[in-house]
A protein has these predicted regions:
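Rossmann-like flavin
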Residues: 34-139
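Helical element adjacent to the flavin cofactor pocket in flavoenzyme catalytic cores
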Residues: 103, 113, 145-185
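N-terminal FAD cofactor-binding segment of flavoenzymes
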Residues: 1-28
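Residue-level detector of beta-strand face positions
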Residues: 30-32
């Protein structure tokens, strides 16, 4: 289970599975290229490397290095700084050396390109900013942490669609006598 959902339900001594049915996906994304090549992107590292090797053997090592580097970004940007408010310039200034070391001045695409040579693989491995409305060519490489975040926790599907997550949260809130105001801005 995605830990944030589980953590929320645990606060109320409830099991998320009683409210929301999430199932881990085996294939996360399917990329179909102009030339007909298909890449099934997943959490299965052996399968990922095999598919990368079929496209460009030299990029397997680059992929492994990219994953290691995105773990460093994840450790800093998600694990360490996710709860830090950047409401004062000094707080941000203290993080500058770390952010520079993590190449935050590069775009996601530029970071990926420093490890991956094949253009198909570059586009595939730099697509993560699109998930949050960003442009891989201009979004800071800090968003590369999404690549590692997926590897750490996987990608899940809400059975019945995302609306069922809302329904499950609403049910929990009603049981906890939390006032809901609906139909208003």
């Amino acid at each position: 289970e995605p830990y944030l959902i589980e953590e929320l339900f645990t606060l109320f001594n409830k099991k998320s599975q009683d409210y929301i049915k999430l199932t881990p996906l085996k294939t996360w994304y399917r990329f179909i290229y102009e030339d007909g090549d298909v890449f099934n992107y997943s959490g299965d590292e052996d399968q990922m490397k095999k598919q990368i090797e079929e496209i460009n053997k030299e990029d397997v090592r680059g992929y492994e290095q990219l994953v290691k580097f995105t773990k460093k970004i994840f450790d800093k940007g998600f694990t360490e700084l996710a709860d830090v408010p950047f409401d004062k310039p000094l707080v941000m200034m203290k993080q500058l050396p770390s952010l520079l070391k993590l190449k935050s001045y590069k775009s996601v695409y530029s970071l990926v390109s420093s490890y991956i040579k094949n253009e198909k693989l570059r586009r595939m491995l730099s697509m993560h900013p699109l998930l949050v409305g960003g442009n891989p060519f201009t979004t800071t490489s800090i968003y590369g942490l999404i690549l590692y975040l997926e590897k750490k926790w996987g990608i899940h599907y809400s059975m019945g669609g995302t609306g069922n997550i809302i329904n499950g949260l609403e049910k929990l809130m009603i049981e906890q006598e939390i006032e809901l105001i609906k139909g208003h801005e």
